[in-house]
Amino acid sequence: MNDSDFMRYSRQLLLEDIAIEGQQKLLASRVLIVGLGGLGSPAALYLAGAGVGTLALADDDDVHVSNLQRQILFTSDDIAQPKTTAARARLARLNPQIELIALKQRLGGKALQEEVAKADVVLDCTDNMATRQAINAACVALKTPLITASAVGLGGQLMVLTPPWEQGCYRCLWPDANEPERNCRTAGIIGPVVGMMGTLQALEAIKLLSGMETERNTLRLFDARSSGWRHLALHRASHCPVCGGRDAHSV
């Protein structure tokens, strides 16, 4: 770390849970963010601000005016630009000291495997079931920690899934690859709800990368109407084709 790093990250360096050692770990880390929408936008901003050394940003979409209600990484000037291009430019202005890799593609197959293999942590910020299942399978196969979240309407959910997957994976809870009936396009979404989930993804990534303890292998459900949380603990089951299986029970 140099003098510029000490100045830039001074507020989080004051935390005993991070300090110099934790910050050095962040600077040496690589995070793959798949999806730059309502989840990936705040996650990318906070991880760039925190000094995660390399951010790989994957999305195959362009910025649309309807995105701006919740995707705070973008402005009206970015409309019709690739999200990865606009995101890299914005994040570079926020923190020019980190490496930003733009991947304008829907990651899958070999490309997904290669990017997951390079990452210390993967953030699933996508909005379709097939991609979520593919990301989960790649993370399990390559033993890469996965932080997955989603939000629709006034509800959100978050999971931190880590090897050796003794308490389950994403496929264990959602074995059906079909798309859910409710999504942001059909049921709507309030920006702060999805933003909260994306911010928590960034927080959990910072905790994992810096060596802090965190709540793993638990499905956390948020209800914005009551501002309440429910936690579902994962338990092993035998039928999962990805990791060997798990189920969830309320705690």
Predicted regions and their residues:
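Adenine nucleotide-associated cytosolic modules
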Residues: M1-V251
